[in-house]
Amino acid sequence: MVPVGAAMLLLALAGSVGRTGNVAGPGTRAAASALAALPATMLWAWERPEDLRWLPPEAGVAYVAATVELVGGEARLRPRGFPLLVRADTAVLPVIHIDASMREPPLLNAAQHAAIVAQMLAAARRSGPQVVQLDFEVRASQRPFLLALVADLRRRLPSGVALSVTALASWCAGDYWIDALAADEIVPMAFRMARDDGAIRTLLAAQGGFTRPRCRAALGVATDEARVDAHGARRYIFSPRAWDQAAWRHVQPP
């Protein structure tokens, strides 16, 4: 990740990647150590200006470093266009967000695969805490592409870099299909759940969290939705607006 200064401007991750890392699989000791070094609370910093210099040291920031737009047969890179200010002691990790066009569904070809891999490897080369995150919501027909992509990323990332992948909450409930996903951390997003919202919230309240083996390590929640009564070793928090101290206080445990 880009080195962080006392008040640093984080800009785009761009360019191609040359060398690749060692072969590794999910759950390696090195990757587990990298994840263990992350704070238990991570704020998602989306594509907008963010000043998080007030953030307590026990929290970190997962910031969108770049977006790869998949349109038809093309992969269009959109580097981060807004500043992010953090303190030097704040743990940060880069997120590569994948935006698959609804109007022109992506072909999910080799060039698009390669473009995503290039951005993830570029993020890993600049990483401080050795964790990178892929944010890619796929349709059922696109699942084989995601499985192959994540497997390729895990093979090509250095063994000491952990791979975190976001997941729809339904993938960790009745529509569980991610057991073979070669990620070191899976983050089920328990917000924006549409028609599954009521059922999944009931399930989480009854079980105390997701119980599927790959879905217990982390949980994604949002500031503008009802509190999710569920445990998770690490919590990622999304805000639809720029973060401030009031929003931070709102998401603290009662």
Model-derived segments and spans:
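Secreted glycan hydrolases and related glycan-binding modules that recognize and/or cleave
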Residues: 1-254
